[in-house]
Amino acid sequence: MAFKIASSPHVTRNLHTSTVMQRVILCLLPGLVVQCAFFGWGTLVQVLLAILVALSCEAAVMKLRNRNIKASLSDNSAMLTAILIGVAIPPLAPWWMIVMGTAFAIVIVKHLYGGLGHNLFNPAMAAYVLLLVSFPVQMTTWIAPSTVALHSPSLVESLQLIFNVGAHVNMEQFRLGIDGMTMATPLDTLKTDLSMGLTTTESLTKAIFDGSTGVGWFWVNLAYLAGGLVLLKLKAIRWHISTGVLLGLFVASSIGFLLSPDTQASPLMHLFSGATMLAAFFIATDPVTAATSPRGRIIFGALIGVLVYIIRTKGGYPDAFAFAVLLANLCAPFIDYYVRPRTYGHSTS
């Protein structure tokens, strides 16, 4: 075997922040496209509105801090935060909610603590929790996927509903069901049915489910999984956190399902419903708010996965990734303190 010997210096090229953010955004696109295909133009409108607000807030804060506005906007961190918020909230949520959430994420969560690299919590998830706690009805009102809905809002109708101007139908009609079914996510529907005494098998016979997963949500999660795998291939993220999240959720949900299959969702449904793949590859992997060591990252991810299962099954919210990520952010310094790599030349860290 022939080896090519190159002269020194052997310099490796580090990825700039803007390059990493660009790769993450590009890998988000498959999931965004599939989500728009199933849930309409509203998702795209929310994303574009969030980007506009995020860039405006970023520029305003940089101006107040006498920092370089162009450099801050070009690192793409504000745009990524905006996209994550835009895909997380319901497609037809009122415009002022995405404005409020995005402004809170950029101004308070990110810049109040010093800007990029200094925030204690994931900005997108902090904004999501703020909106969910403040406006639970609007944040849990989803339209039915296009494959089962008798009427999906067009681009014009989506704009009218989001901005509440001149719409021939209102959000209440979509919520009550133009298509004759409740507008709730599969996880929310299953949780409600179980609380009413139905079994998992009985609940899964509803039109919003497709076998063992929710209609549309399986393909949305599959698209985000594909994007996440590309992200790993590009080395924009490391595998530890994503693996920890999925493994923690899979093990916890498998134990629950084996112990009580009539009252628990299957591991497949937990993995391919809600924001599982989006959170595992694009949210939990935020390097600023996560643990730093390889073992610490696995523990950090597994903690998120277990917390998601606990909150989904025992808590008041059907999808719990935002709460799980924020709680894990709180634990990250603790994990880093006790899970440190061994110092070279010493038997202990």
Swiss-Prot record:
Gene Ontology CC terms, in alphabetical order: plasma membrane
Predominant location: membrane
Paired cysteines (S-S): none
Keywords (A to Z) from UniProt: Cell inner membrane, Cell membrane, Electron transport, Flavoprotein, FMN, Membrane, Phosphoprotein, Translocase, Transmembrane, Transmembrane helix, Transport
Lipid bilayer topology: Multi-pass membrane protein
GO BP terms: electron transport chain; transmembrane transport
Transmembrane segment boundaries: 20-42, 77-99, 124-144, 212-232, 239-259, 265-285, 291-311, 315-335
Quaternary structure and interacting proteins, as annotated: The complex is composed of six subunits: RnfA, RnfB, RnfC, RnfD, RnfE and RnfG.
Coiled coil regions in record: none
Signal peptide segment: none
Cofactor: FMN
Protein name: Ion-translocating oxidoreductase complex subunit D
Purpose: Part of a membrane-bound complex that couples electron transfer with translocation of ions across the membrane.
Family classification: Belongs to the NqrB/RnfD family.
EC number(s) stated in the UniProt entry for this protein: 7.-.-.-
The keyword Translocase is annotated on this UniProt entry: yes
One Pfam short name: NQR2_RnfD_RnfE
Enzyme class label: translocase
Upper lineage: Bacteria, Pseudomonadati, Pseudomonadota, Gammaproteobacteria, Alteromonadales
Cellular compartment(s): Cell inner membrane
Residues recorded with modification FMN phosphoryl threonine: T185
